[in-house]
Design a protein with these regions (language model features):
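Active-site/ligand-binding-proximal alpha/beta "capping" segment
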Residues: 94-151, 427-435
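N-terminal glycine-/serine-/threonine-rich phosphate-binding loop
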Residues: 2-69
């Protein structure tokens, strides 16, 4: 049987409508007094309830109680306040419709031209871990009813659901002799229905979480925030970023125009440094490129050879702030790959950090905040186009994550586990693990949590010194990361530190020249260009020289975002150094072919971090 579809109800066709009566009922009272003052100034009668009415009267404004308007008192502990024909009749009446006008007159119903409301804070109540009964009590009934009535009749009535709309509302009214336009009413109605959908979705999801059965269909409502020039590629237009309705963005844009990949980098990089800070108590930084870290580090003092390799004087290094120290380590883990990076710093960015970042080629930064001096320095980068994002304080992401791919939506619980020293309590070996090693293991775990899978990383002295990301084979991850470890260490070799560059060779060119010197596999034409960097062309760095230097490598931890299915990855890792005491750290406990009876391979102890499986694979 076909459903009965209602016919349209006709009335007057009006663009600008000046409100004669507005109903105000808000839990978030931000800006409400100012808005009520304006409405009162244009002769609009104010109706309200409870705390909102009291707030308006405190400002010296006349406000009529809803109960007085309806001649029906609130009842049932306030559960019934506005569910009354004099409220919904006033909202739903079609102006100029003869039957509606007669019904209103017969029932003593006056028009209500505007509703300003917020819904009960259901999500906030749930987020606090409140009892089920309290959560149920914070499900709004009257609010959504008024919202839908007002939005349905948007041809004549205006629905306002957020303080963020107040400025647009008053600007429009001031430009139209105190009236709202049809275009604004329609736009606000769309926002209202989206708000209602998100609200009901959160209630449905919460109730589903209280059941043993699987969750019902979930509704997700997105609020466009920033248009983007294009997506991953120039042909992918239009593009933009949206917030999830009811939740703020995790950052604000302070300067510049971020792109699609910039924002992906920022979102992942910020989570990485925030978790590192929480887990270790140290300032943390990362250097991101294409949604994976090129480097990540903690504020651990630099050695003399590191200072030379990073082109920082020991005097300057001694006065570095934690933020600067962490970023200098992160940037110099793999400075060739960090060219044009997106930086993230867990702490406030100070002047010293900004001055260091100013001389590097970088696309942008996200941080906890900025001193005024640092902000002015960074705003000068890239001719004023340097991207500066400030993380939203105390932002809590939703517990569920969704991703749309090829017409499908994937969902999963957010990986909210933050690795800490508590996860390092059990070891297969009997060796004592000192705090510095645990610190580096935590660094490795959290870094790989935000690295494209498969991924393997090596850490040393509070710094990731080699990250192998996005390989199909785990042993290839080890090989890739291992090459980066060798390059990092050999950058501190006396022959490399002694390279005599010509005056005027740029910093990044010096970085690249050192890396190519270590690699040594030049084409004829490339060698000519490379030699042009030096006052005196250096002697080759021979394989024997490199091998002898690498034998001194020790204290390096190995992290993996999942278990090693074969021992070949560990075998290859052991080739990087012969000194015992290196740590191979795995992301889960599982019997596998690489495990030896003594709990180690080639002198590398294997530490199991958890009793239960814990993997941090990231696939975009």
């Amino acid at each position: 049987m076909a459903p009965h579809i209602l016919s349209a109800v006709t009335g007057n066709s009006v663009d600008v409508i000046k409100p004669v009566r507005a109903l105000i009922s808000v839990s978030d009272k931000t800006g409400i007094v100012e808005l009520a003052t304006y409405l009162s100034s244009i002769g609009c009668e104010l109706l309200s309830t409870g705390g909102t009415a009291a707030k308006i009267r405190e400002a010296g404004l006349v406000c009529k109680d809803v109960a007085e308007h309806t001649k029906s008192p609130e009842c049932l502990d306030g559960r019934v306040k506005t569910l009354h024909p004099k409220i919904h009749g006033g909202l739903l009446a079609v102006r100029g419709n003869e039957k509606h006008e007669k019904d209103m007159k017969d029932n003593d119903i006056g028009v209500i031209d505007m509703t300003i409301l917020n819904l009960y804070p259901f999500e906030a109540t749930v987020a606090k871990g409140s009892p089920f009964e309290m959560c149920v009590e914070n499900i709004d009934i009257g609010g959504p009813s008024m919202l839908r009535s007002t939005a349905k009749n948007h041809a004549y009535t205006t629905i306002v659901t957020s303080p963020s709309q107040y400025a647009e509302l008053t600007d429009t009214m001031k430009s139209n002799e105190g009236g709202t336009t049809l275009a604004l009413r329609k736009r606000f109605a769309a926002r209202a229905y989206a708000t209602s959908a998100a609200y009901d979705s959160s209630i449905a999801s919460y109730f589903a979480s209280q059941l043993d059965s699987e969750a019902p269909v979930a509704a997700r409502v997105y609020q466009p925030e920033y248009p983007l020039k294009y997506g991953c590629n120039p042909q992918q237009k239009p593009a933009g970023i949206s917030s999830i309705l009811g939740s703020p963005l995790p950052f604000s844009v302070v300067n510049g125009k971020p792109g699609y990949i910039n924002l992906l980098d920022a979102a992942n990089a910020w989570q990485l440094v925030k978790e590192l800070k929480e887990a270790t108590g140290l300032a943390a930084a990362t250097s991101f490129k294409h949604v994976s870290p090129a480097g990540a580090a903690l504020a651990v003092p630099l050695s003399s050879s590191e200072c030379q390799a990073f082109e920082i004087s020991e005097t300057d290094a001694a006065s570095l702030t934690p933020s600067a120290l962490a970023y200098i380590r992160a940037r110099n883990a793999d400075p060739m790959c960090s060219f044009g990076d997106f930086a993230a710093i867990s702490d406030i960015v100070d002047e010293g950090t900004a001055l260091y970042l100013k001389k590097e080629v970088s696309d942008g930064i996200i941080a906890a905040g900025y001193t005024p001096e640092a902000l002015e320095i960074l705003k000068q980068k890239k001719k004023g186009n340097f991207i500066i994002l400030e993380a939203t304080p105390d932002f809590v992401p939703p517990s569920m994550e969704y991703r749309e791919v090829f017409g499908m939506a994937f969902s999963q619980k957010r990986n909210s586990i933050i690795v800490s020293a508590d996860h390092m309590k059990e070891s297969v070996t009997k060796r004592t693990v000192d705090d510095d090693v645990k610190r580096d293991m935590i660094l490795g775990c959290i870094t790989l949590k935000y690295t494209q899978s498969n991924s393997v990383g090596f850490g040393k002295n509070g710094q990731m010194v080699g990250i192998g990301a996005g390989q199909q084979s785990r042993v290839d991850c080890v090989k890739l990361a291992g090459r980066k470890v060798a390059t990092f260490m050999l950058r501190q070799h006396p022959q490399v530190l002694g390279l005599n560059f010509k005056a005027g060779v740029k910093r990044q060119d010096r970085v690249n020249a050192r890396v190519r010197y270590i690699e040594g596999d030049f084409t004829t034409e490339e060698r000519v260009r490379w030699e042009a960097n030096f006052e005196v062309v250096p002697e080759p760095l021979t394989s024997d020289t490199k091998e002898a230097y690498m034998k001194e490598l020790s204290g390096v931890i190995l992290s993996s975002d999942a278990f090693f299915p074969f021992r070949d990855g560990i075998d290859h890792a052991s080739k990087l150094a012969t000194k015992r005491g290196n740590i191979a750290e795995r992301m889960q406990q599982r019997a596998h072919p690489s495990r030896e009876e003594d709990g180690g391979i080639n002198g590398i102890p294997i530490l199991f971090r958890m009793r239960h499986f814990l993997e941090f694979k990231v696939i975009w």
